[in-house]
């Protein structure tokens, strides 16, 4: 059986965080004093201007003020924000070079979904953005970029991560004796990053930064403020706050340290291959295991991936041609074996029994609309273009299966995050970046 397009949703972005991030990038420049714009960084053949950086800086200061967080020194904040822009820029450049795009129809659907998440119509959402000084057209462009970044990560990293049944078995065996395996944690973290192969001097310098951060925390400085000043993690400006995570999705070391802690407590410095961590336990909750009866779908699919060699347009053309052949009587299994680029191709595209949430939203929505025997029109997801056929449906007790699925997702999440950071660092290292922040 091939992959089930896992990762519960490659576009499961936390909408409120996303909205805040978009507003940051699009706030109007400070009025009153006019400054001469100039280049603060060159990224390959692209430039980042002082105006862009100032817009993000002003909005970030506004956001930190709303959160009641004392901002780090201006020079530190500028450097962190500039690096964030650079990382986004190199990813978007790769996406553009490889033909990764988002259609207007998909973008409009996403905007409607964001508005609904905020209990607004699209028109009400437009007005709300305007009241915050955010242009809807610019917001729309930023959302397009965010979708592209998510899909790029899935294409280049996440869908290349594999998890074996042996890894799942071992994971479950090691979790059996843990009293907190059903616990979920909401934590904040500070990461002082250092590459795994860094020399001792660089690692010592990173350790000293971590000790400085810990000293500030012990002196009573708010965790969010210290995270904003010291952390190298992408969520530093959000106070290092992470969403709820099952204990199974944390590293074993983190889970062991967090188990005896009370909400509000802070760890010491935790070394890891990629740097030094400091954690704060914000909340803990318990999710008891219960019998789960759910509706499942047995389906098969054909996948044409978008890659450096196959543009989105080429992939769409190929999958459309395959759909025409199916409409003219060709057998789904035979075409899947010959043309599908998913690991399920040798079995005729058979994905086995699929539970709600196993696949990405685009795939699940199209599959749910089909009757047994029916074949979908071409469906786009972060993995590429699909044709889907529903074979049959059933209601099933999946308690044990869900346990294994949860373990599989935890392993995949750990592997994917490590792989993504390594991939992003390689992409960053290959890029030509020239800093001109001190000029002007």
Curated annotation (Swiss-Prot):
GO terms for molecular function: peptide binding; peptidyl-prolyl cis-trans isomerase activity; unfolded protein binding. Its EC number is 5.2.1.8. Residues 182-283, 294-392 form the PpiC domain. It is an enzyme of class 5 (isomerase). It is found in: Periplasm. InterPro entries: OMP_Chaperone_SurA, PPIase_dom_sf, PPIase_PpiC, PPIase_PpiC_CS, PPIase_SurA, SurA_N, Trigger_fact/SurA_dom_sf. Residues 1-25 form the signal peptide. This is Chaperone SurA.
